[in-house]
Amino acid sequence: AELNKLKIWACYYYHQMGFNVTHIIPSENIKRDKDNYLKKNPFKSSTNNRENYDIIRQSNVDMETFDWHNAKGIGTVAGFNGLRSLDFDGSTNTALLSTVLKILGLPENYEWVVTSGSNNGFHILFYCGNFEFAGYKRRLKRYFPNKKHKTYFKCIDFIWYNHLILPPSLHKTGNNYKFLNVEYPFEKPLLVAGYNLRNMLFELCYEYGGFNIIKN
């Protein structure tokens, strides 16, 4: 998909899938963050105000007001209707991905696996209710691998209420986010049980009686 078709993807695909949609204009984000003395990745921040997007359904009129002509990315907000994401950083290991999908009870060719624009990580989108290890509202929790898996990935971020970047958004490297197994998913993300997430953490991150985590 081309970036100049972002509005079409937003209005006629992601929004119809049930997502609340954001748009990303890096140049506008840089100016805004500079004025507010903030340091954020301009390719990952929503340009529009996304306050309450995790609890209130977005209207079509709201999306129509966005500057899609200049947008370089599209996103959504985790938390709405239980939409979640796992962000595996520092990994291109297909064996790891297969293991994770199996533990989570997802098909091996799961449609909602996204290859990061960095080409050094992947995201898995799914639905899930409350999960005690996921962190607090508007904060992410990061887990690090145990010794057995330290060469497989750098960390896992639980994106529970935060901003998610969606294909075909532009990454700062100049690459685009892409779905791994399909051009675009046909079905909505699947439901993952909390106990499967717990099993994944114990397999990949548990060591010496606890988890090595950072709260952001």
Task: Briefly describe each language-model feature range.
Residues A1-N216:
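Conserved phosphate/metal-binding and DNA-contacting active-site motifs used
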